[in-house]
């Protein structure tokens, strides 16, 4: 069952209005129907595919996806940043193998006389506040609410993991402006869907996608892109998570 089989029109309208008022840039606005964005552009789809194949360790198909992403206009640094970002969700081994595959692809393209755009480097971090405070603020920006309540059970049980999440993931990684928050969340949802069996985290990041301006239709499109390379059972589970999330907002 796909999302538009169950989502009331009201839900789509609400999300669409949120999209407008948040002032999301044009890169997130591909094709639309009655003002509701239903698709992802070619760069976004390439990011989804590259992230998924890297997380899966499907290096043969990753080579083709990397070529496709570069041809679609992704810069070298944007693709590198996708692979740096996803290690936080699927581990260093997958990320490093993906980066080595990317090196191979770039060498082959260079040998063919193809000059790819390196793109922008990450801007220097000038905020001198403690990384924990910066990471907490970045996370609050992502979820659009204050996070001053009781800590989650895992944070109480193993406090250091919560410190790592704030200081490393949401400060060290999310502060890097090679990718914006939308792109990072798109990559995150792609990876979580691909690895499977992490439904609570997948729901949280799908919700952040909606908060950051993606529409239900765009998240459905993400799942359609992933259907080409991800097990049917994982896509079904992710679609159920998305449908339940949308229903909970009515």
Tell me the role of every PLM-derived stretch.
Residues 81, 85, 90-93:
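Substrate/cofactor-recognition hotspot
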Residues 26-43, 55-72, 77-78, 92-181, ...:
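Acidic, glycine/proline-rich low-complexity segments that act as flexible tails and inter-domain linkers
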Residues 57, 196-197:
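Alpha-helix capping and inter-helical loop/turn segments
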Residues 44-53, 63, 79-83, 183-193, ...:
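Short, structured motif recognition centered on aromatic/hydrophobic residues
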Residues 192, 207, 211-212:
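An amphipathic alpha-helical core segment
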Residues 199-207, 220:
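Short conserved catalytic/interaction loops centered on acidic-Pro-aromatic/His motifs
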Residues 12-24:
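Bacterial N-terminal signal peptides
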Residues 1-14:
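Bacterial N-terminal signal peptides that target proteins for export
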């Amino acid at each position: 069952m796909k999302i538009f089989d169950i989502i009331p029109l009201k839900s789509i309208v609400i999300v669409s209005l949120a999209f407008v008022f948040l002032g999301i840039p044009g890169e997130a606005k591909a094709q639309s129907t009655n003002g509701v964005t239903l698709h992802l552009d070619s760069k976004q789809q390439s990011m989804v595919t590259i992230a998924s194949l890297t997380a899966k360790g499907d290096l043969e198909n990753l080579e083709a996806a990397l070529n496709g992403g570069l041809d679609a206009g992704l810069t070298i640094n944007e693709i590198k940043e996708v692979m740096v970002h996803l290690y936080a969700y699927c581990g260093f081994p997958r990320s490093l193998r993906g980066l080595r595959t990317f090196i191979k692809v770039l060498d082959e393209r260079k040998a063919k006389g193809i000059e790819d755009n390196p793109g922008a480097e990450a801007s220097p971090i000038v905020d001198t506040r403690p990384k924990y405070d910066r990471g907490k603020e970045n996370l609050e920006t992502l979820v659009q609410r204050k996070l001053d309540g009781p800590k989650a059970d895992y944070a109480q049980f193993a406090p250091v993991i919560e410190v790592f999440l704030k200081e490393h993931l949401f400060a060290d990684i999310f502060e890097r402006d090679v990718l914006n928050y939308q792109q990072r969340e798109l990559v995150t949802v792609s990876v979580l869907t691909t690895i499977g069996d992490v439904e609570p985290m997948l729901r949280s990041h799908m919700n952040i996608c909606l908060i950051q301006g993606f529409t239900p239709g765009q998240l459905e499109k993400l799942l359609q892109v992933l259907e080409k390379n991800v097990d049917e059972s994982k896509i079904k589970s992710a679609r159920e998570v998305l449908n339940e999330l949308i229903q909970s907002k009515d």
